[in-house]
Amino acid sequence: MWICIAILVVILVGLLIPVVKERRAWIAYAHGGTGLFFASMLLNIGLQQKGDIGDIIWLEIMGFVLFVPAAILIVSAIVAIVQGNLVKTGIMRIVRHPMYLGTAIAAFALILVFQSKLSIVLSVIAIALLWMASKMEDDYNVERFGDSYREYMRLVPRWNVFKELK
């Protein structure tokens, strides 16, 4: 198991060095969080870590159900951001960082599905990295788009989708 984790760390560091050199740390956090999400999934499957802290079927079902809104957020974000400009329509009028939120929800779902120590550790780190990436990307977007992004930040929550669904 430790060999797999060491190989994963080497790969992630190799992928992140060019990003850090560009001085866009939020991209490094985003890639790190997404990488840890996939690492958690693959390592739990490959090392058969499922259920080492419990095997509660209704939690597992909830985890699988959570993949649906996660996928919707991620796909909606991909469709929205292809424009390249400041997008304030579609999913982006409900939440500022739907791709990060979707990946974080999927990472949380992995905890429920696998119910293992490995999934908890990797997914919690992934969620923290994605949160930091969204905060840093806000700073970057304020520099890029100025007052229009500040107004967008005031109106649209970073991750709280329920704020707009009142």
Regions found by a protein language model. Name each.
Residues 1-88, 105-166:
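Membrane-anchoring alpha-helices and their flanking helix-loop junctions
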Residues 93-105:
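Membrane-interface loop-to-helix entry segments
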